C-alpha cells in the first residue's frame, strides 16, 4: 500500500545500521514531512515506525513485514516507563498499523515526547507482538511536521 511503501522506501536511504529518526521534507502548498525509524533488534527487512504529515493529515503508523489478519487491534504504547493504552487500525491488507488521525492521534504522539524508546505491544504472540523503536529527540525532530500539519496552538 501507499503508506507502507512510503515508510520502506525512506528506510532504504538509511546509511549503516543506525536507528536515529530519519526526516524527509517536500515543500510546497501542502508540504509533506515523513519521519521514520526501524524496529530495534530485528533483522532486515525491519518493521518501520513512521510519523507523517501528508495532505495536511498527521499520522503515526507502523509498516509491518508480516501481515496481521485483523482490522483493528488494542495496543499498549510503552514510552520509556509510561504505558499508554490505545486502539489502532490495521490497514493496507494487514501490513500497516495506524493510530487515530487528527487531534487524538496528535495527542498520542505528544505523549511520546521526552521518551528515548517506544515499544508498540499488540499482545500478539508473533514477530509483530512487541516492536521497539528509538524515538530519542522526537519532540525536536518533529518540529517541521508540526508546522506542515498546522498543529493547533503551536
Show the residue positions of the predicted features:
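A generic "folded-domain core" signal
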Residues: 1-154
Amino acid at each position: 500500500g501507499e503508506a507502507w511503501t512510503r515508510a520502506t522506501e525512506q528506510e532504504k536511504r538509511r546509511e549503516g545500521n543506525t536507528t536515529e529518526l530519519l526526516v524527509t521534507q517536500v515543500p510546497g502548498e501542502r508540504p509533506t514531512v515523513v519521519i521514520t525509524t526501524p524496529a530495534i533488534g530485528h533483522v532486515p527487512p525491519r518493521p518501520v515506525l513512521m510519523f507523517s504529515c501528508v495532505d495536511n493529515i498527521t499520522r503515526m503508523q507502523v509498516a509491518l513485514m508480516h501481515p496481521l489478519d485483523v482490522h483493528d487491534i488494542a495496543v499498549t504504547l510503552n514510552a520509556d516507563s509510561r504505558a499508554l493504552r490505545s486502539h489502532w487500525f490495521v490497514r493496507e491488507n494487514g501490513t500497516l498499523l495506524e493510530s487515530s488521525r487528527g487531534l487524538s492521534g496528535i495527542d498520542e504522539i505528544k505523549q511520546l515526547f521526552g521518551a528515548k524508546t517506544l515499544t508498540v505491544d499488540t499482545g500478539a504472540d508473533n514477530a509483530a507482538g512487541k516492536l521497539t523503536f528509538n524515538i530519542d529527540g522526537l519532540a525536536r525532530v518533529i518540529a517541521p511536521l508540526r508546522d506542515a500539519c498546522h498543529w493547533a496552538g503551536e
